[in-house]
Amino acid sequence: MKVRAITLGCKVNTYESEYILSCFKDKGYEITNDIADIYIVNTCSVTNMSDAKSRKVIHRLVRENKNSVIVVMGCMIEANKDIKLDGVSIIIGNKDKAKVVELVEAYLKDREQKRLLYENFDSTFEDMFITNMESRHRAFVKIEDGCENFCSYCIIPYTRGRVRSKNPDTVIKEITTLVKNGYKEVVLTGIHTGHYGSDIETSFPELLKEIVKIEGLERLRISSIEITELNDEFLNVLKNNSVIVSHLHIPLQAGSDKILTLMNRKYLTPYFLDKVEKIREIRPDISLTTDVIVGFPKETEEDFLDTINFCKKIKFTKIHVFPYSRRKGTKADLMDEQIPENIKKERVKRLIDVSNNLEKEYLDSFISKTVSVLIEENKDGYSIGHTGNYLKVKILGDIKANEIVSVKIKERENLELVGEYEKDK
């Protein structure tokens, strides 16, 4: 039987889907990106739009694949536990993803809908371990699940539960296996990655110290980390280990202290700026990307301008801009002075323009420099990949995928760099 996974949302979902596919593959099922006998839909619910997108995918699959087994799982289910999904074979939240093959095989015997949802999450990490990823040149490794920050706009602590960390020995073994299988870059993922270890008497920096010792690992990337987790121990690890790439994604969410307080973020802008300055003392050319929510309740034009000016001051490489999305069950949903949609859209556009200008300025600083590029694909006569600081580079000619090569940057084409392969370096 053929199995296909459709993954929405974050890198954690991507990792979990890869793990589930590997379990099916081990049982003799065929993995496909085409028409399948079994569909796995790993949903997202971080915004109303992602929730609606998940529902749309499910309804289309049910309509077009009446004889297939359809499994729906993840955050959208956790956020809507009473949801009715006619035509869906198996409905689970985030707790039993490791049991999907077992559930599918039980369904194939009796053809009765399986629905496994719980009021509480387990206190321990649901172990998953992968050795390969389908069609990828960097491997994701999930080290943590859950979040306890309870930002006023966010549903995720309710859909993912409290922080649970993977055993550090398991993390090391998994990454070692992936490196032996040819992966040069590993990305550490989690719902709140920097809180790794808070439940098992260790810490994220302690884990990093062990990972960087793995022989053959050329690049270690952190998918996202909060500014409050960039403590002296972390900064010291970053300073002394070049295998950790010069790219950090640090969510800002707002550049107005008033809005940060309403969001229940754990810092204000002076703290954020101080940490960024310390990072740049260690890695002057580091790429810092971020997330910003615009149109949060009570956000005035002055508040929004504070955000624009702060982003310019930090000089982010790229800003992922999101209009505020009301989520039932969060404190922000009950706040007064909700911002009209037309104002949100206008602010999104303005901040994206700021982001594009900052990104171009950063990209231009690499013209005439030599950089290392992990080749990921060959397309239209070019080899395409990313630098350690996650800049997209294209090089004329075919270079073998999964190689890290030296490239001299010649020019910028909009938001991409164009370079020349330096064979002798």
Task: Say what each PLM segment does.
Residues 70-71, 79-82, 180-301:
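Conserved SAM/AdoMet-binding glycine-rich loop
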Residues 134-137, 147-148, 244, 254, ...:
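Short flexible coil/turn linkers enriched for glycine and charged/polar residues
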Residues 1-194, 233, 248, 270-281, ...:
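Proteins enriched for Cys/Gly/acidic motifs involved in redox and nucleic-acid/cofactor modification
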